[in-house]
Amino acid sequence: MSQPPAAHVPVLYTQVLDGLQVTENGTYLDGTFGRGGHARGVLEHLGPGGRLLVMDKDPDAIAVAEQTFGGDARVSIHRGSFAGLGQVVAAATVDGILLDLGVSSPQLDVAGRGFSFGKDGPLDMRMDPDSGQSAAQWLAQATDREIADVLWAYGEERQSRRIARAIVARRAEQPLLRTAQLADLIASVMPRGDSKTHPATRSFQAIRIYINRELDDLETGLDAALAALKPGGRLAVISFHSLEDRIVKQFMARYAKAPPSNRRLPEAQPFVPTLQLVSGAIKADDTELNVNPRARSAVLRVAEKLELGIGDSGLERRSGRIPNPRSPIPASQGDAR
């Protein structure tokens, strides 16, 4: 199998294409185009009758897609979150869907996008810079409790309260407008330790996830993807942290495995699975990590949609939605959680 151009190294490239099992005349959707590494691989396997739909909420990614694939009649390009993929494709019409979650390498590498604590830039963090509040705008008006809740829920940051108090105190003196300001402030209040991880890592992740509603989009997008797939279609999802992977894992299991039964209660209907798990967690091997260290935290999961049982829509048979981790933190809890 050919490899993507060296300018962009998509994670788990071969494993994604193997998981999707691209066919010559199939219809595929890349819900997170980025710089198109995986999309190029899909196109290599499509014939003249195949079709690829690409989506991204980032206008820079859409510009790259139009420049790269705008002349290819097999490709249609759509700006927007994959949470809205149901507005782009009809139900049960797609052979394979890829969701490559989180922030892209170009977003991290360009200081002006405001995602990186290692490169000074405007404190923005929006994947779609034309929509919603920037990180700076939110931090300027959120209460210390709201900031602490976000840092804990989306970054599992044990020092969330300490960091939140420091942010509120500092903004009273001067506005927080730059990524370096925030990163330095967080580092200054964190306990010294031996970790090689930057002290602002969890906080930047948490604020980014909140600003972009990433976990909300993921839950909505997984439901939409399942509805869009044909029977026999494949869903491949790459996650980069435990919050994302937990949602993906539980979603796939919910449609593939019967929930625990309660012997005291009669079963209204027998469970009919809608998905079959194709693989467990797939991670990058040492060869890939030597080329692309950012693949270290990537986890790929693949599932295949099954034929629905008679009289069972399949999509409504759930054990309940995954709770959103944006839950209030009991006031009695301190910084160590």
Curated annotation (Swiss-Prot):
Reaction catalysis annotation: cytidine(1402) in 16S rRNA + S-adenosyl-L-methionine = N(4)-methylcytidine(1402) in 16S rRNA + S-adenosyl-L-homocysteine + H(+)
A molecular function (GO) term: rRNA (cytosine-N4-)-methyltransferase activity
Domain of life: Bacteria
Annotated spans, Disordered: 314-337
InterPro entries in the cross-refs: RsmH, SAM-dep_MeTrfase_MraW_recog, SAM-dependent_MTases_sf
Single GO biological process annotation from the record: rRNA base methylation
Subcellular location: Cytoplasm
Keyword match Acetylation: no
GO cellular component terms, semicolon-separated: cytoplasm
Keyword DNA-binding attached: no
EC number from the UniProt entry: 2.1.1.199
UniProt entry keywords in alphabetical sequence: Cytoplasm, Methyltransferase, rRNA processing, S-adenosyl-L-methionine, Transferase
Binding positions (S-adenosyl-L-methionine): G36, G37, H38, D56, F82, D100, Q107
Gene3D superfamilies: Putative methyltransferase TM0872, insert domain, Vaccinia Virus protein VP39
One Pfam entry name: Methyltransf_5
NCBIfam families: 16S rRNA (cytosine(1402)-N(4))-methyltransferase RsmH
Protein family: Belongs to the methyltransferase superfamily. RsmH family.
Summary of the function given for this chain in its UniProt record: Specifically methylates the N4 position of cytidine in position 1402 (C1402) of 16S rRNA.
Name the record gives this protein: Ribosomal RNA small subunit methyltransferase H
Gene transcribed to yield this protein: rsmH
